[in-house]
Amino acid sequence: MTTDSITFNHILGQGRVNQLGGVFINGRPLPIHVRHAIISMAKKGIKPCHISRQLKVSHGAVSKILNRYAETGSISPGQIGGSPRARLTVQAVEKEILIACDENPQMSAAELRDWLIHKDICTKGNAPTVPAIKRLIGNKGVGVPKKMERKRLSYSIDSILGISIDECSKSSSDDEEGSSPSNDASSRRNRTSFTAEQLDVLENAFRADTYPHANARESISKETGLSEEKIMTWFSNRRARCRKNMPMYQQYNVQGFGSSPPSYPTLLPSPMMFLPSYSTSPQLNPLFFQHILQSSPPSSQSSPPSSS
C-alpha cells in the first residue's frame, strides 16, 4: 500500500498545505499580492472569514494583516514587532506624535497625520492611520488631567460614616509617617502593639460584650489610651478569631465525653448570638467558651463510668 505525498518544487523546500487547501511556507510571510488581495477585499466589505475561505489563507493570518493595516497603514510584513529596527522606528513615530500633542493639544488626529508627512517623519504609505493615532493618544492619556477629583457617592461608606476622603488619606499618611522607622516601612502594614495591661482590659470587655457600644468604647479608650478605631479593629479581629475556632468547640460539644454531664457549658453556639442585638450574659456567651475550654481542657483518656 502506497501513499501519495505532496511535494513542492520551491527554492526553500518548506511548502505546506493548510486546512483550507492553500499553500504556505512555515516562518515566511504571505506574498505581497495576497496581502493586497486581502486588503482590497476587506475594503469592499467582505468579512475576514469569507476572505480566508476564498483565498485559502488561515483566519489568523488574515486578521493579523488587517490589524496591522489598521494600526500602521502598511501592508508589508514586519512593521509591528520583528526586527529591533522596526520597533525603534514605531517608537520614534509615537514619540513625535506625543511631543506634537504636548505642544499643541488642539491638533486632531488627521492634522497629526498630515504633520508627520509634512515633516518627512513618515510617508503617505507608512504613516499611521487616523484611528491608530486616536488610539495612541487615548492610551497615553494626552490632554486628560492626570488626577481626577473623586466624587463621593451618597451610598458610599464615606458618606454613611461621615468621613471625608481627604481626612482619611491625611490620617493614613500621618500614621505611616509616625509609625514607620525607615523609608521603606510605608510599604509595609502598620500593626499596633498592645501591652499586657491593654490586652487585659480588652479581653475583659470582650467577655462582657462582643459588640461594645459607643459609651463602652469610650471607657475602654480612656483606660487603654487607644483610639476608638483601633479598639473597633481589635474587636473585629477578635470576633473573627472566635468564629474561626468555633467549629472545634462545636465538635467537642457534640461528641461529648462520658455519660455524666460535664462541669462546663455545652450549649451549641448559634449564629444569632454574634448579632449586637442578641443580649446574653458572660456565662452563656458562646465566645466565652474559649476561655473555659482553655482553662479546663477535656481529657482524652476519659471514659464512661462503669455501672456497678
Swiss-Prot record:
> Mainly localized where?
nucleus
Provide the residue span(s) of the region labelled RED subdomain.
92-140
Q: Tell me a GO cellular component.
A: nucleus
- TM segment ranges: none
Segments of this protein annotated with the region PAI subdomain: 16-72
UniProt DNA-binding residue ranges: 13-140, 187-246
Localized where?
A: Nucleus
Q: Which GO biological process entries does UniProt record here?
A: epidermal cell fate specification; gonad morphogenesis; hemidesmosome assembly; nervous system development; regulation of transcription by RNA polymerase II
Effect on the protein upon substituting residue 29 to L: In ga96; causes defects in embryonic development, larval body morphology and vulval development. Adult hermaphrodites have gonad migration defects in which one or both arms of the developing gonad fail to turn correctly
Q: Where is this region: Disordered?
A: 168-191
Keywords from the UniProt entry: Developmental protein, DNA-binding, Homeobox, Nucleus, Paired box, Transcription, Transcription regulation
List the Gene Ontology MF annotations in alphabetical order: DNA-binding transcription factor activity, RNA polymerase II-specific; RNA polymerase II cis-regulatory region sequence-specific DNA binding
Domain of life, per UniProt, equals Eukaryota
Q: What happens when the gene is disrupted?
A: RNAi-mediated knockdown causes embryonic lethality, vulval and gonad migration defects, and animals that survive have mild to severe body morphology defects. A marker of the lateral hypodermal (seam cell) fate, scm, is expressed ectopically in some P cell nuclei during the early larval L1 stage.
Q: Which family does it belong to?
A: Belongs to the paired homeobox family.
Task: Extract the PANTHER family matched here.
Answer: PAIRED BOX PROTEIN 3 HOMOLOG (PTHR45636:SF49), PAIRED BOX PROTEIN PAX-6-RELATED-RELATED (PTHR45636)
Chain's role:
Transcriptional activator. Regulates the lateral/ventral epidermal cell fate decision.
| Full protein name | Paired box protein 3 homolog
Organism taxonomic ancestry: Eukaryota, Metazoa, Ecdysozoa, Nematoda, Chromadorea
